[in-house]
Structure formats: C-alpha cells, structure tokens
C-alpha cells in the first residue's frame, strides 16, 4: 500500500498527516487541517516523506494545473528544493503502491 506523510512546515515541522490513496482535492480533507480552525490541507504542504509507492503533486484540485515529477520513496525537507513553492499543492495522485 502506498503511503506518504506530509507536513505543513519545512524540515518536517508543524503538523503532519498521512495519505494512502490519491486525494483529488485537498480542500475536501475536512478535519485534517494543520492548525485548529483549519479545515483542510489545500495549499498547506511544505515538506513530505514518501514511505512507499510513487506519488505526484498538482497545483490545482482534480490533478490540474502544473504537475510535479513522480516521487518514489524518499523525502523532501522543503518543496522549494524540489522546484516548486511551499504551500502550493492542491491534489496528490498515487501512481503506484
């Protein structure tokens, strides 16, 4: 089963959550937001760790807009190091387990 952990701050800081399936709209992840009063993870991710599988990030909901390359097991301490902005991701696609 594919698994990815995301954080709302760089260097695995702040709040974290885990996904095991694609999320076509991070705004719909109600109750999983990084701070009290935050309803979702849309435009909140700043670092991540791919535990298993292959994953791809998208600028807009529904896997729209700019797409990143596909990432396999490994980690990114700062989205800017991967070539895109922090707090930019609006959907996540699991490519494989």
Which residues fall in each region the model found?
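Compact beta-sheet-dominated domain cores in extracellular/mature segments
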Residues: 1-97
